[in-house]
Amino acid sequence: MKNNLLIVLALSSFNVFGQIENSSFTATGRGAATTFVTDYQALGINPANLGWHLEFEEKKFAMGFNEFTYSIHSGALSKQTLRDEFKSAIRQEEGASFTYDEKVQAAKDFSEAGLALNFNYGSFGFAYHTDKFGGIAFRVNDNVSWYSKFNEDISEILFLGKTAPYFDSLMVLLPSGDTSMILNDTSMVSGLNQDSIINGIATLPSNISKLFDGSQISLSWTREYNLSYGRKIIEKDSVFALYAGVGIKYFQGMAYVDITSNGDGEMEAFSSMSSAFGINYGDAAALNPSNDTILNSLLPRSVGQGFGMDFGVNILLFNKLKIGLAVNNIGSITWDGNVYAVKDTLVFDTESSGLENFNVASQLGDILGEDGLFEYNGLASKTVKLPTVVRFGASIELGKKIELGFDMILPTNEVPGPGSYQKAIIGFGGDVQPLPWVRLSAGLMTGGNYDTSIPIGLTFVLGKGSFEAGIASRDAIT
C-alpha cells in the first residue's frame, strides 16, 4: 500500500484567495492552479485534471485530511489587527470594547473601505487513478466568505449606533430618572455616560434602500460534497492529447446574507442563517414559515441545500504544454430555513450602541437581529444561483524540475453576491523542485476581492511521494 498511496497531512495556508484553489495548500503559494493541480485537489478547479497521472505516477491513490486556507483583506485595518480579530473569531472570543472616540475613528476608517474574508476547510479528500479507468475523486469542503463595504452613513450607524450623526436627536436618561430629548452634538455626546443614552432619533428619516446606497453586506457558508471524474479522450502519439472531466456537487448551506442597494428604491436584501448563530429576529420570527430554532449538538444545522456541476477540458501538447478550460459552480441552492427578506422601511430610530470591536462575526446578531437596522418579512424559501466562474489557464514544463503557468478566473454573475468575486483574477506563477523532497512555489496575482499579491509556498515531499506537508502564503508582502 505504501507504494500506491499519497497522503497529505499537516496542511495550512495563510492570506489566500480561498475560491481560487479551495483548501489546497499545494496550489496556494503558486498563483495558478487550473492546469497544475492533480488528484482530489483538482475538485472545484478543473475536473479534467483527474485524467492526468497523480503527481507521483507510481501512485494510484491519494488521500488528504484537514487542509485549510484563509484570507483577510481590508483597506481600513492593519495586518496585525486583521490577524488578531480573525483569531478571536475562530476562538469565539470577544475583543476589547471600543471607546467612543475609537468608534468614531472606526466609522471613518471603514467608510468606503471594503472588508473581505475567506476561509476554506477541506476535511477529507480521496482520489484514484489508472491509465485505463481515468481518475475519480471525492472531497468534502467548507467554504466561508464575507464581503462588506459601507457608505459613510451606514459605517457611522454600524459603529456608533444611536449616536451616529444620522440620528439628529437623542433620548437620554437624566440623574433624576426623567428622560429628555437633546440634539446629537458630537462634542457633547463624547462627554456623556453612554449608558444614559436610550436611543437615537432621526427627525428626517430615510428609507433603508436610500440610506444603504452603495453599501453591501455579503456572507456565505456552504459545505460541499464533490464527486468528480476525468479521463483522457484522445491521444495522438506524444504530440496531442485531449482530456475531459465532470463533477457533481451537493451543497449544504449554513449561512447566506445578501444586502445591496442602488439607492433608487431597488434593494436586494435577504438572509438565511442557521439557528447556531443565535440571531433574534423578534416578532418577524413568529410569522415566518421557515422559522427554525432547532440546535444540533455538534455541527450547525443546515438551512439550505442544492446541487452544482463542474466541467473541464484540457489539451496536452508535446507532453509539456498544458492548456485548460473549466466552468465551475453551475447550479443553485434553495434556502429554506430562517429565510427573511428585508423590508424597505423608514429608519426612524435605534437603541443599538453599535459594534463594540472589529470582530464582526461575533456581532452578527447586532447587525441582522431585531436591534439592528433591518425589518423583515419571513419567506418559505428562496433559490439563488451558485457563483459560477470560468477558468482558463496554461502551463509549461521546463525539464523535470520547473513548471510555469498562468490563470485567468472570470466571474459570470451579473451582480456580485455572496461567495463571488467583485472582479476578474489574473495570476502568474510556478513550481521549482531543487531537491526530490522540496518544492518551492511563487507567483503574482491581481483582481478578485483583493489587492495585487505575491504568493509563496514551501512543500516537503516525504517517503518518495507517500506524504506531503507544507505551508504557503498568498502574499509574502503582508
Where are these regions (language model features)?
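Bacterial Sec-dependent N-terminal signal peptides
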Residues: M1-S23, A394
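N-terminal, post-signal peptide beta-strand-biased segments of exported outer-membrane/organellar beta-barrel
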Residues: V16-L170
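Outer-membrane beta-barrel porins/channels
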Residues: Q19-E21, K132-F133, A137-N143, Y147-T478
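Short coil/turn segments at secondary-structure boundaries
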Residues: N3, D109-G114, D213-I217
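Short hydrophobic "helix-edge" motifs at membrane interfaces and signal-peptide entry regions
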Residues: N4, T35-T38, F318-K320
